[in-house]
Amino acid sequence: MDLLKKEYTGITYISGPLLFVENAKDLAYGAIVDIKDGTGRVRGGQVIEVSEEYAVIQVFEETTGLDLATTSVSLVEDVARLGVSKEMLGRRFNGIGKPIDGLPPITPEKRLPITGLPLNPVARRKPEQFIQTGISTIDVMNTLVRGQKLPIFSGSGLPANEIAAQIARQATVRPDLSGEGEKEEPFAVVFAAMGITQRELSYFIQEFERTGALSRSVLFLNKADDPTIERILTPRMALTVAEYLAFEHDYHVLVILTDMTNYCEALREIGAAREEIPGRRGYPGYMYTDLATIYERAGVVEGKKGSVTQIPILSMPDDDRTHPIPDLTGYITEGQIQLSRELHRKGIYPPIDPLPSLSRLMNNGVGKGKTREDHKQVSDQLYSAYANGVDIRKLVAIIGEDALTENDRRYLQFADAFERFFINQGQQNRSIEESLQIAWALLSMLPQGELKRISKDHIGKYYGQKLEEIWGAPQALD
C-alpha cells in the first residue's frame, strides 16, 4: 500500500452517477478510485472517460451527499482488478466481487484485470469437444461445444431463469472416447446474473444450494437496485474467474450470463448520462464492440487443457429478433437457442423451438468418439421430419385433417409426439444416449423409406425402438 496518495479536489460537476474532475492527468481510463465526501464516507468509482481537461468517474454507489467543495478523489488501482482463487468455488459474490454469503473474504492467489489478458488469435484452438447439458433439444439438435459461445434468446414471461438453473445443475463434460482411456476432467460453472429482482435472487440461491450445484460453481449476483455500473462490471468479473480456473487450473468452465438485456440497458443508461450521441433505438453506437469484449473471451487456447464456454441469455423486447441486442449478439456468437412462446403456452418445458435454433459449431463436437456415430444424421432427420409436421399442422388449420394422406397423418402424429416426448422433458437430466434413444423411437413412427437423411447401416442398427419400451406403456401416444 502506498504511504502517500494523491488526491484530486477539482470536482466541477456532478450529473447523476457521474463525477467530472478537472486536471486529473494521472488518472487513466479504467482506473479504480476512492471518492471521499466531507463526512469521511468513502465510495468506489471507475474512470470511464479521460480528456486533456477532465476525467469522468462513474460512482459505484449513489451520489447523495457529494458536493463540489468537499469531495476528493484518490487513485486505488490503475485498472479494475479482481482477486481470484480456487476458494471461490462454492461461494456467492455481488456484482463487483464482494462476498454476500456471510463467509470470510477469500485469500486471492492473483489479482487479475477484469478486462482480460490479450490473447493471440493464432493461439486459439478449434472447439471440438461435446458438453452435455442434459437437455435433449440442445444436446441432439443444437450441440454445445467446449469453447463455444451459444446464446439463448428468450422473451418476457418465458422460463429463461429455470433453463439457466437447469443447465448449471446438469451440465458436464464427457471424456474424449477416441483417445486411450477416459480421464475425468475438472468442470466448473461460473454464473453471473445482472439486474435481477430479489425474488429471482432467492430462486437462484435456493436452486444452487438445493441441487448441490453450488459446490462446483461461482455465483456473481447483481440486483436490479444495485448501481448501474455494477452491471457493466459483473460479466467481466465472472469471465476473469472463468479464465483463471480454465487457464491456470485446467478446468472446463461453463459461463452462464443472464440477462444480457439488462447489461445493454445499463450501457444505454450510462451513455445517456454522458450525453453521448445514441445509435439504434437509443443504444450506444459502440454496443457491438462492447458485447464483443465479453463474448470473445470464450475459447480454447493452444497449450492449455482448460476451456471457457459461454451461454449468454437475453430477453428479446417484444419477441423481436431484429432488436439491436439479439441482432448484434447473433453477429458475434456461434448460433442461438430460441425459446418459443407457442410451446410455452402448450405447457411444454423447456420450450425450445429447434427450427429457428442453430449451433454453428455442432459438426465439430459430434460423431464417433465424441457422442455417437449416428448423431448428426439423427439430428438432420429430426429437423426435416418436425419441419414437415409443422407445415402439415398449418395446412390442417386451413383445409382440415380429412384431406390429408396417410403419410401426412404420420408426420402430423410425429410432430405432436416430438413436442410431447422429446422437447417436453421437464427437469429430467438426460444423457446423450437417452436422448438419441428417444429420437430413434420417434423416428421409428415413420416408414424407413422416409428416413432419407440416415444411412442404411444406422437404420438397421437403431430403427424399431418403441416409445412404450422407454416409458413402460401405455402412456406413449394415448
Curated annotation (Swiss-Prot):
SUPFAM superfamilies in the cross-refs: C-terminal domain of alpha and beta subunits of F1 ATP synthase, P-loop containing nucleoside triphosphate hydrolases
CDD domains: ATP-synt_V_A-type_beta_C (cd18112), ATP-synt_V_A-type_beta_N (cd18118), V_A-ATPase_B (cd01135)
Any one GO BP annotation for this protein: proton motive force-driven plasma membrane ATP synthesis
Short name of one Pfam family: ATP-synt_ab
Keyword Transport: yes
Alphabetical keyword list: ATP synthesis, Hydrogen ion transport, Ion transport, Transport
Recorded GO MF terms: ATP binding; proton-transporting ATP synthase activity, rotational mechanism
InterPro entries: ATP-synt_VA_C, ATPase_a/bsu_AS, ATPase_F1/V1/A1_a/bsu_N, ATPase_F1/V1/A1_a/bsu_nucl-bd, P-loop_NTPase, V-ATPase_su_B/beta
Biological role: Produces ATP from ADP in the presence of a proton gradient across the membrane. The V-type beta chain is a regulatory subunit.
HAMAP family, sorted: ATP_synth_B_arch
Family that this chain belongs to: Belongs to the ATPase alpha/beta chains family.
Name listed for the protein in its UniProt record: V-type ATP synthase beta chain
